[in-house]
Amino acid sequence: MIFKVYYQEDAAQMPVRERTKSLYIEGESEADVRLKLAKQNFNIEYVTAVTGAYLEYEQANSDFKVVNI
C-alpha cells in the first residue's frame, strides 16, 4: 500500500504549514511507514493511505514518486 506522509524536515523545527513537505512511501501500515522513517530526522505531521481515485489523481501529478527507504 502507498502512503502519503506530510512532514517537516527537522524534528526540532516548529510545524509551519509553509514548510510542510510530503513524500510517498510503500508500507504495510501507518505504523510500518513510521518505523521506516524513524531513522530520518523528520517531524511527521500526518500519514494517510493513498488508494483508489486518490491514488490515480496523485499518480497523474508530475511530482509523484514513491521513495524507497
UniProtKB/Swiss-Prot annotation:
GO terms for molecular function: DNA binding; DNA-directed RNA polymerase activity. Gene3D superfamilies: RNAP, epsilon subunit-like. GO terms for cellular component: DNA-directed RNA polymerase complex. GO terms for biological process: DNA-templated transcription. It holds the Pfam family RpoY. It is an enzyme of class 2 (transferase). Coiled coil: none annotated. Keywords: DNA-directed RNA polymerase, Nucleotidyltransferase, Transcription, Transferase. InterPro entries: RpoY. It catalyses: RNA(n) + a ribonucleoside 5'-triphosphate = RNA(n+1) + diphosphate. Its EC number is 2.7.7.6. A non-essential component of RNA polymerase (RNAP). Belongs to the RNA polymerase subunit epsilon family. RNAP is composed of a core of 2 alpha, a beta and a beta' subunit. The core is associated with a delta subunit, and at least one of epsilon or omega. When a sigma factor is associated with the core the holoenzyme is formed, which can initiate transcription. This is DNA-directed RNA polymerase subunit epsilon. The gene is rpoY.
